[in-house]
Amino acid sequence: MMKQILFSGVIGLFLTLVGTPLLIKLLARKGYGQYIRDDGPREHHSKRGTPTMGGIAFILATIIAYFMSKVITGYTPTFSGLLVLGLMAGMGLVGFLDDYIKIVKRRSLGLRAKAKMAGQLIVGIAFAVLALQFADNHGNTPASTRLSFVEDFGWTIGPVLFVIWALFMILAMSNGVNLTDGLDGLATGAATMVFGAYTFIGVWQFQESCANAQTLTNPAACYEVRDPLDLAVVASALMGACFGFLWWNTSPAKIFMGDTGSLALGGALAGLAICSRTELLVALLGGLFVLITMSVVIQVGSFRLTGKRVFRMAPLQHHFELKGWSEVLVVVRFWIIQGMCVIVGLGLFYAGWAAKK
């Protein structure tokens, strides 16, 4: 069973390493380059015209890697895995439309705010509704109407509030990754770490599944998660695909993921969190995305209330650029912060299991 995880990760890595330069040539030939805002850091002006919509590469690589791992190992796809992939692809489609309009109209704003929000809501609602269907033999659906941290806890919120909660998570994570994607490799590297964490979480939940309670040494701490191993397969495919894409996306970037990629990655993170019953834990596992999002909230709130800005520029990474930090220095230090968030998050995940011994 574990071979699926290995195959999906390796195939995802290979496909983006080999496929991304082909996409770069195609986008460059069509003139699909990034528009750079004039009010941003001066160093970014040299990036104008760099091919964007690179998220196409790792979206396709992830989907192909997932299904190839199934063909090679003989296992069938699960509803949980397909739902996460569908959420990723749907959010990626919204981002693609946004990127395409930016390129065609040669402006930094693509879809109108209402249209972009409507697209994300349609995809998010479809995911949330379907995630409460398809119960397995143990009665577990891909998602649960109970809130979760390292697993479900006692608060049942019902299907309507769950849909609202799921929408909040999807929008928050998607736009969090989108805001983080402002420096070469920053969002890609950070996302790779979080998907690595979810690969581990999926494997651990599979090994400690309540479906195998009779063979567990600590059955009281088992996990009621549908298809945990398949969630690990999806996470591994995403980790490998992002890692391969990082080769081309790191400074100086040969391609940007665009909203196509950032919305897709955020959707995948939210989907994995919801289906693995780690909805609140993802705020720590993806701590860098939360931190950068909060910097924008603080900046906007402060300016509207007091007329003053807290940071030289938001999102946070640009504040440090304007303080004189090089782009690479900001990226590496923010990666370190993200790595620490993942370590602490996984530590809490394990502690939640160990506390039930």
Curated annotation (Swiss-Prot):
Uppermost EC category: transferase
Membrane spanning residue stretches: 4-24, 52-72, 77-97, 115-135, 153-173, 186-206, 228-248, 255-275, 280-300, 334-354
Catalyzed reactions: UDP-N-acetyl-alpha-D-muramoyl-L-alanyl-gamma-D-glutamyl-meso-2,6-diaminopimeloyl-D-alanyl-D-alanine + di-trans,octa-cis-undecaprenyl phosphate = di-trans,octa-cis-undecaprenyl diphospho-N-acetyl-alpha-D-muramoyl-L-alanyl-D-glutamyl-meso-2,6-diaminopimeloyl-D-alanyl-D-alanine + UMP
Molecular function per GO: metal ion binding; phospho-N-acetylmuramoyl-pentapeptide-transferase activity; UDP-N-acetylmuramoyl-L-alanyl-D-glutamyl-meso-2,6-diaminopimelyl-D-alanyl-D-alanine:undecaprenyl-phosphate transferase activity
UniProt pathway: Cell wall biogenesis; peptidoglycan biosynthesis
Subcellular location(s) of the protein: Cell membrane
Family according to the record: Belongs to the glycosyltransferase 4 family. MraY subfamily.
HAMAP family for this protein: MraY
Name the record gives this protein: Phospho-N-acetylmuramoyl-pentapeptide-transferase
The organism of origin for this protein: Streptomyces avermitilis (strain ATCC 31267 / DSM 46492 / JCM 5070 / NBRC 14893 / NCIMB 12804 / NRRL 8165 / MA-4680)
